[in-house]
Amino acid sequence: MTVYRVVLAEEAADDLLRIEDFTIERELASATTDLGVVRRLRDAVDRALRLLEFSPYSCRKAARALNDKQRELIIPFGSAGLIAAFEVRGEVVRIGAVRHQLEQDYH
């Protein structure tokens, strides 16, 4: 069994920080603020990324993929979720971008 090494590109790491900020802003604007939301977000991302260590090809092919190595991981979270765009190169899974499904530029 191949164990893949998961690597976050700098852009993807920046995306995750931006998504945390986005999540905090949405939560602070809600009527019932939940301060544990960021911890749960991080846990959801960590769990999902661990899947890529063992089974990256179980994720869907990217919509505009140039080859079968470009994939998307759906990360369920709350009423929406996140999409992590990644590419498999040998035994390395490189995550290039992460988007929240409620962001304006998601579509």
Regions found by a protein language model. Give the residues of each.
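Enriched for short, Lys/Arg-rich terminal
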Residues: 74-107
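Basic, Lys/Arg-enriched alpha-helical interface segments
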Residues: 1-71, 77, 106
